[in-house]
Amino acid sequence: MLIMKKLLLIAATSATMLSSSVSFAEGMDHEWYLRIDTGAAMFNEEKDKATGVKLKSNTTVPVALGIGYYISENFRADLTLGTIIGGKLKKSGAATNAPFTRTNISASHKPTITRLLINGYVDLTNFDMFDVFAGAGVGSALVKEKITYNGITGLSSNTKNRTNISYKLTLGTSAQIADGVKVELAYSWIDDGRTKSKNVIYQGTSVPTGGMHYQSHNLTAGIRFDI
């Protein structure tokens, strides 16, 4: 219930900001649009707090849906709701932190991330066939993770949702393929913040777990439909 209230508050704030942008352009003949994006993403490497093992990312699939508005010929803004599918930070190796030093383990951190962002984009160049644009976004992310260990018994755990400020920087290109339909190819860097830290008692010792910082490099394809 608390999570739903937070998301509703974030949505209301973002919608107000988007409405303000629309009001600024009131009286001009511009259009709303819907968008959908997906692609591939990799998280930055992170160190597992409990064991000291440096974790690497697999390839995850980001997905986002949104609604936006063309404020001017070269500027637009949108509100997007996104998540990830199948992302993990994992690694097998020898632990370096006590009390697990030199123990061969396998660590896995599987995050659940839901982000709501308000984004702004500006076209940097306009060619006959395509445009090049840059953008930035800010909003909120709900982040939690499932932590599992092989080789150590009783240390696996789950963290609860944490609400973080999320940031996004984008550089991409777009092209019109039909009347009112544009496609995009873009690179984005996204910072969703850290998960909650949690201490687990292992054989009488308090061991810190969680606290992963989820930053990702994203390559996505998207499509925009004017409405």
UniProtKB/Swiss-Prot annotation:
Pfam families: OMP_b-brl
Keyword annotations of the record: Signal
Signal peptide, first to last residue: 1-25
UniProt cross-references to InterPro entries, sorted A to Z: OMP/PagP_b-brl, OMP_b-brl
Keyword Cell membrane assigned: no
Assigned protein family: To R.conorii RC1281.
Protein known as: Uncharacterized protein RC1282
Lineage: Bacteria, Pseudomonadati, Pseudomonadota, Alphaproteobacteria, Rickettsiales
